[in-house]
Amino acid sequence: MSSSSEPTKFKMVVVGAGGVGKSALTIQLIQNHFVEDYDPTIEDSYIKQVVVDGAICILDILDTAGQEEYSAMREHYMRTGEGFLCIFAVTSLKSFQEIDNFRTQALRVKDADKVPMVLVGNKVDLPKRDVSTKDGNDKALSFGIPYVETSAKTKQGVEEAFFTLVREILADRRNQEGQKKSDSKRAKFKCTLL
């Protein structure tokens, strides 16, 4: 991160099917509070200052609607995001299967083969699981992204999920910087054959 004491900003977008706990996870991180009632989100924005790996970070988190009818709005929000938390409920196989669509949408909107992303299996505090830890790990491995299991209710893994995304965004920024330097070196040393 930056060597100065100036906080670094990270624009995150939280995506996933309706009812998987996107808002509950975000509110748990921001306000240290668990929301019991399900109130479908259209769009909410949150900002929180945290310390990740000794550096001050500003998390700018956009909590999006999971319902399909808001897909066009979600695309607009995805354009501004640097990284994505793709959340499913371990109690819902359907929400797990829908993650592929959210990932594909993010890649298409960002016009990239890879974007900073973390797969999050939420609601691990509930006794009935339809998605195993192995299934979550396997999907994350196939995407080439980290996997974190969480519970908005017990706080398990909440910071880990968001902080892992910070690290993924940082790695992507470093990779892009390295690519720019490499491209500029190639531009400076062109050979001319006579």
Curated annotation (Swiss-Prot):
SMART domains: RAB, RAN, RAS, RHO. Its EC number is 3.6.5.2. Pfam families: Ras. Keywords: Cell membrane, GTP-binding, Hydrolase, Lipoprotein, Membrane, Methylation, Nucleotide-binding, Prenylation. Its main location: membrane. GTP binds at residues 16-23, 63-67, 122-125. The modification Cysteine methyl ester is found at C191. Residues 192-194 form a propeptide. It comes from the Eukaryota. One of its GO terms (cellular component) is plasma membrane. A motif (Effector region) lies at residues 38-46. GO terms for biological process: signal transduction. A lipid is attached at C191 (S-geranylgeranyl cysteine). GO terms for molecular function: G protein activity; GTP binding. It catalyses: GTP + H2O = GDP + phosphate + H(+). It is a lipid-anchor. The keyword Amino-acid biosynthesis does not apply. Alternates between an inactive form bound to GDP and an active form bound to GTP. Activated by a guanine nucleotide-exchange factor (GEF) and inactivated by a GTPase-activating protein (GAP). InterPro entries: P-loop_NTPase, Small_GTP-bd, Small_GTPase, Small_GTPase_Ras-type. It is found in: Cell membrane. PANTHER family: RAS, DI-RAS, AND RHEB FAMILY MEMBERS OF SMALL GTPASE SUPERFAMILY. Ras proteins bind GDP/GTP and possess intrinsic GTPase activity. Belongs to the small GTPase superfamily. Ras family. This is Ras-like protein RAS1. It comes from Hydra vulgaris (Hydra).
